[in-house]
């Protein structure tokens, strides 16, 4: 995962967010690896001043986390180091049975540097995060699901079709409601419970001004599928 790939990811997210016809993005890699981490050969000669001036890694990757539309991480094979951090920037992770997660940067004499220590701790707690970050061990998909890092596991054979079905289910909803709900959930990690509930209530009330709310509730009463217009 070199700098060119990071820039490409940022541009893809920019285009996705601007395109009104797109309602859900799947971020994935190959069957063997979601992403096996940063390009170590590219990193090796860098100095402190190099990485500081470049805002190395996070400058482009954080665009995934800041996207207002939903992004699903579809993890098959290895998601190590920066790959695991990139997956955690997505809204939720779906893993294949063969998926493996890890933050092995400690083996290189450094720490995670793209949000790994912060997001991992929020997702799975201090003890498990310390375990992964200090030992560099890999975590199997089953363990990742059991502690909440992964939302669900799909079979290797049906993985691609299964993830696409999930994305279609997300995309079928009102994009306005989806974006607001995403904003609410993300706020839970950054504020107190009382403030979070107030924030949720304000956005919930604002949805009553949308045409999609009118359509969604009318469709429910009339026992038909809603036709959302994202308005």
Indicate where each model-derived feature is located.
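Glycine- (often His-adjacent) and acidic-residue-rich active-site loop
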Residues: 18, 29-63, 79, 109, ...
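Short C-terminal tail/terminal secondary-structure segment
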Residues: 225-231
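Hydrophobic core positions within the conserved protein kinase catalytic domain
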Residues: 9, 13, 61-64, 167
């Amino acid at each position: 995962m070199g700098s060119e790939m990071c820039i490409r990811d940022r541009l893809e997210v920019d285009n996705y967010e601007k395109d009104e016809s797109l309602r859900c993005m799947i971020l994935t890699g190959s069957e063997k690896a979601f992403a096996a981490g940063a390009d170590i050969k590219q990193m090796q000669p860098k100095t402190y001043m190099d990485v500081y001036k470049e805002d190395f890694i996070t400058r482009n990757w954080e665009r995934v986390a800041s996207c207002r539309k939903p992004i699903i991480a579809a993890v098959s094979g290895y998601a190590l180091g920066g790959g695991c951090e990139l997956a955690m920037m997505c809204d939720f992770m779906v893993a294949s049975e063969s998926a493996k997660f890890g933050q092995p940067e400690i083996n290189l004499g450094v720490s995670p540097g793209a949000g790994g220590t912060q997001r991992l701790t929020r997702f799975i707690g201090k003890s498990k995060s310390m375990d992964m970050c200090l030992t560099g061990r890999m975590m199997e998909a089953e363990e990742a699901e059991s502690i909440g890092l992964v939302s669900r596991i799909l079979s290797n054979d049906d993985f691609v079709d299964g993830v696409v079905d999930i994305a279609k289910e997300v995309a079928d909803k009102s994009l306005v409601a989806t974006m607001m709900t995403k904003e609410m959930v993300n706020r839970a990690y950054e504020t107190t419970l009382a403030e979070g509930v107030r924030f949720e209530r304000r956005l919930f009330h604002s949805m009553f001004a949308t045409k999609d709310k009118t359509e969604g509730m009318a469709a429910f009463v009339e026992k038909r599928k809603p036709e959302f217009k994202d308005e």
